[in-house]
Swiss-Prot record:
It comes from Xenopus laevis. The gene is plppr5. Keywords: Cell membrane, Membrane, Transmembrane, Transmembrane helix. One of its GO terms (cellular component) is plasma membrane. It is found in: Cell membrane. SMART domains: acidPPc. This is Phospholipid phosphatase-related protein type 5. Belongs to the PA-phosphatase related phosphoesterase family. GO terms for biological process: phospholipid dephosphorylation; phospholipid metabolic process; positive regulation of filopodium assembly; positive regulation of neuron projection development; signal transduction. The chain crosses the membrane at residues 5-25, 61-81, 120-140, 194-214, 223-243, 250-270. The lineage of its organism: Eukaryota, Metazoa, Chordata, Craniata, Vertebrata. Its main location: membrane. Induces filopodia formation and promotes neurite growth.
Length: 314
């Protein structure tokens, strides 16, 4: 099997994985394939009686704005960053650190600029859908209630026989409110907005830190990266302030987004470092500069006895 044929097979395999990830995220997000777990509640529980904040579109950070930022900003920054790095390498003739043009499949030569850009954006997109899947799976399995759940649920406490605050209601038909709002209020753990925002911010911050090597950016890079993380933190704070999520929901979303971003950057794209061919791992000119390690010789008792016997015979 030729090397080009192996690359073609791997390319198709990765496309199948990406398509499957997108389809799974679609089924979680826009279909009723996965039923939300119906979690019970205590009568008159003050943890779930916060006022209804309105639809997500009325939030200070609506879904359209959030999705536009987590998709548009990383794409723009990575494209501009890779273009600048490539142009600087060509201008300074820094061909050692520049990736080579490779043959993919049977006919296609991919430029290093295009290859790095597609690789980093592809991994980012995969992580974005993976974060969405993790969050939706957690929401479906737990069915955790929003702070305004009882406000939209509108349970009939008299019919349910609520005479004590400690009485636990497990009836799936206890709510008399709008079904769509009730289902939405059952899907809060973990917070999707917190997970997506911190994933995008951390991935972009690690890209900026690992890629930008220009002089005079000793303070610019930390300020820019911390600014991105601050925006993600404010997104989580906004979810709690508007009574759309609990603190535990936001913290869990942060942990999911951070974990996926760190895993992809460290283990998959190798901290955004360029790939090198096999003969570049150990340059010939550097072999002479390598320290020589002398390993002590361990005598074999059998060999020693053999030499002694041979000396006696002679």
């Amino acid at each position: 099997m030729s090397f080009q044929f192996s690359l073609t097979i791997m390319l198709y395999f990765q496309m199948v994985i990406m398509a499957g990830t997108v389809m799974l995220a679609y089924y979680f997000e826009y279909t009723d394939t996965f039923t939300v777990n119906v979690q019970g509640f205590f009568c008159y529980d003050s943890s779930y009686t916060k006022p209804y904040p309105g639809p997500d579109e009325s939030s200070d950070i609506p879904p359209v704005l959030l999705l536009s930022l987590v998709t548009g900003v990383p794409v723009l920054v990575i494209i501009v960053g890779e273009t600048v790095v490539f142009c600087l390498q060509v201008a300074t003739r820094d061909f050692e650190n520049q990736e080579k043009t490779l043959l993919t499949g049977d006919c296609c030569y991919i430029n290093p600029l295009v290859r790095r850009t597609v690789r980093f954006l592809g991994i980012y997109t995969f992580g974005l859908f993976a974060t969405d899947i993790f969050v939706n799976a957690g929401q479906v399995v737990t069915g955790n209630l929003a702070p305004h759940f009882l406000t939209v649920c509108k349970p009939n406490y008299t019919a349910l026989g609520c005479r004590q605050f400690t009485q636990f209601i497990t009836d799936a038909n206890a709510c008399t409110g709008i079904p769509d709002l009730v289902i939405k209020a059952r899907r809060t753990f973990p917070s999707k907005d917190a997970a997506l925002s911190v994933y995008a911010a951390l991935y972009l911050a690690m890209y900026i830190t690992s890629t930008i090597k220009a002089k005079g950016t000793r303070l610019a890079k930390p300020v820019l990266c911390l600014g991105l993380m601050c925006l993600a933190f404010l997104t989580g704070i906004n979810r709690v302030a508007e009574y759309r999520n609990h603190w535990s929901d936001v913290i869990a979303g942060f942990l999911i987004g951070i974990s996926i971003a760190v895993f992809l950057v460290v283990c998959v794209v190798n901290n955004f470092k360029g790939r090198r061919t096999e003969h570049e791992h150990w340059p010939t000119e550097n072999l002479a500069q390598m320290p020589i390690i002398s390993i002590p010789r361990v005598e074999n008792p059998l060999e020693k006895n053999h030499l002694t016997a041979f000396a006696e015979v002679t």
